[in-house]
Amino acid sequence: MWRLRTGSSTVDKADSWLSSLNNHLGRQIWCYDPEAGTPQEREAVEAECARFTANRHQQRQSADTLLRLQFQKEHSANRLPSRITVNEDHEVTEDDVTTTLCRALQFYSQLQTDDGHWSGDHSGPMFFLPGMVIALYVTGALDSVLSEHHQREICRYIYNHQRQDGSWGLHPEGTGTLFGTVLSYVTLRLMGESKSNSNNREALRKAQTWIIDHGGATDVPSWGKFWLAVLGVYEWSGVNPLPPESWLLPKSLIAHPGRLPVLYRFIFLPMSYIYARRLSHHLTKIIEDLRKELYTIPYEDIDWNHARKLGAKEEIVPRSVVQDVILSILHNYVEPIMSHWPGFLLRQKALALIMEHIHHEDETTQYLCVCPVSKALNMLCCWLEDRNSDAFKKHLSRVLDFLWLSEDGMKMQVCNGSQLWDTALSVRALISANLLNECSSMLRRAKLYIENTQIQESYPGDLDHWHRITSKGGWPQSTRDWGWPVSDCTAEALQAVLALSSQSTTDVGEALPEERIHECINVLLSFQKSNGSFAPFDARNPLEGPKIWNHTESPGYKSLDFECVECTSSVIQALAAFNKIYPEHRAKEISISIQEGTRFIERLQNSDGSWSGTWGICFTYATWFGIMGLLASGARYYESIAIQRACEFILSKQLPNGGWGEHFHSFKNKVYTNLEGERAHVVHTSWSMLALLATGQEGRDAIPLHRAAKILINAQMETGDYSQEGVVGAVCGDHTISYATYRCVFPIWALGEYRYKLFGKKNMYI
């Protein structure tokens, strides 16, 4: 039976390659224990897994049930008050809200780990996992890192998210793509699945048929071509150039890859190394079979130079004529020169520089790396450099950090989790609930996690050389070991810390030292770009980077480190909250920063009053952030046309049942799109309530708030939990992400604010 282990309990004493800055605080690993669990517990797990499979085409998002089953067993709670139901013709009472909050808080307390954070599914893009599996297979480490139990769960996950036509999307909710289908099919085959010996032979047959019917693997985007070439089922002559020499260009040139958004930069870095080394797995039976199964014509007859230019039209951003010309020149003329003497000498210099950067990234993230794609690629590079190196062994010890198990199977997370982010938001929600008897223990433990996760080290060496900004004082998305400060994570953590400082030290402990808060302000201010926005990772990149190196060909390319209302709003809120408590510290700089950020938010507002989301779905999420950012800057509803228009937008989207529910297709449609059947979603309803409550909606017309509160009260389950209703997170604007804690956090937050604003209850002991 699978069990989630956290913190130091995740460390195998026989593994000497793991390192940590704070004794693995926040680390979370799913481990298989054949002796664990009673027969009844195993039966319950199997029933949940079977239930998901039976309903997988109707409900594609897992509910993180396995975590809940384990933690509810380990962290027993007091008997819950009876569930509340408010009929359509009845008004919401204070007791209704208080009881619902108490039930929600008691349930949520069971999900908190011993070290103070909240764990949860943070998966999304399905193409992350194939890259890691291919990397492990090529290095010969697949079976040593992933046990048969891991591989069985990975296969179950992939099969569960296959669409009825045989394809796979880029994420569980997405329509079928050649990229997703080819990589998922290859992953299953590498794990021993075949049409002759698998219980899922029909699923494999349908997948292969879909691939062939859609042009075969020659039509996958460049990223897919790259991974297939590494595996040895595609030729490098069919891959667009990824010249490592570009890293030797003067940094002042716009074509320097150091100007790429952070995530793309740290993916292009190892890709260019592997491209230059032409890594390709040797021919095996499975490689030979895949060469036959993935293409519409015999492998030896494929025109690879022609294939290099191919790509499914619906899956890529079309390249411009200029881009095509540059890539052709690089492929036909520059690459032959760099592959032979004397150009080879320059290539060797570039490769040495790249490995310096890779080792720096590995060492400053404890071999976790900024994302799972760069993790797999960096691991390959270390293996290529020295197959017996300590660096490669340290990489292998960190693979399991990215894997998460739910009732739909084992998947790869967007990061090594979202522990800090979820915990910071949870603190703010718990404080808003104003029920200290229910919250004080949770808050005390969460505070310790947040404090101990703050980055307390500066990046070693010259920041400009390593393409970094200052790190000391920032907060990461997940764990301190991950090491990357993120603007909105830092801002939300600071707001949580400042909110905790207003609570009784008897309840939550001593406040964070001023010096560390000041260090956080240094980091936050460094994120601001010249246009007033705050980037997620790096403020130094221009708005127009070197598009020629957009190796993903993804339509979400620009959103990864460019204009973002959510990050900008979070930082403005944090700076404003800090300024109220510490009005003398860098006051002028903070004032100017807030003004510039506010102007950016106002410029970004859409004509209908909304804002477009980047990290959540979509207009609902971003409009809440837009409003909160403007309010933090000092704007008020009756004085701000922007806030008035935003509130009008939100109210115009309220459903007849009183809730809100937005489909992730809003990203693609570029217009607000309701969920099918005009269903309400508790998280979207909560975001809308929080936005309206912050602007004083209760004083203008409280009826929309009462109707929304009924949705949140009536949607609560017998356990105090809320059901999984659909995806809520996003990345790049075109890939969905799961945030399993949101369905608990935001109803608590919204009902807490509703209770305070409508019934005037604050800091109650009950």
Swiss-Prot record:
Function (record text): Oxidosqualene cyclase involved in the biosynthesis of alpha-onocerin, a triterpenoid characterized by a symmetrical structure due to cyclizations at both termini of dioxidosqualene that inhibits acetylcholinesterase. Catalyzes the second half of the cyclization, exclusively from pre-alpha-onocerin.
Keywords: Isomerase, Repeat
InterPro entries noted in UniProt: SQ_cyclase_C, SQ_cyclase_N, Squalene_cyclase, Terpene_synthase_CS, Terpenoid_cyclase/PrenylTrfase
Descriptive protein name: Alpha-onocerin synthase LCD
Superkingdom of origin: Eukaryota
Species per Swiss-Prot/TrEMBL record: Lycopodium clavatum
Classification lineage: Eukaryota, Viridiplantae, Streptophyta, Embryophyta, Tracheophyta
Family affiliation: Belongs to the terpene cyclase/mutase family.
UniProt EC number: 5.4.99.66
Site annotation Transition state stabilizer: residues: W421, W615
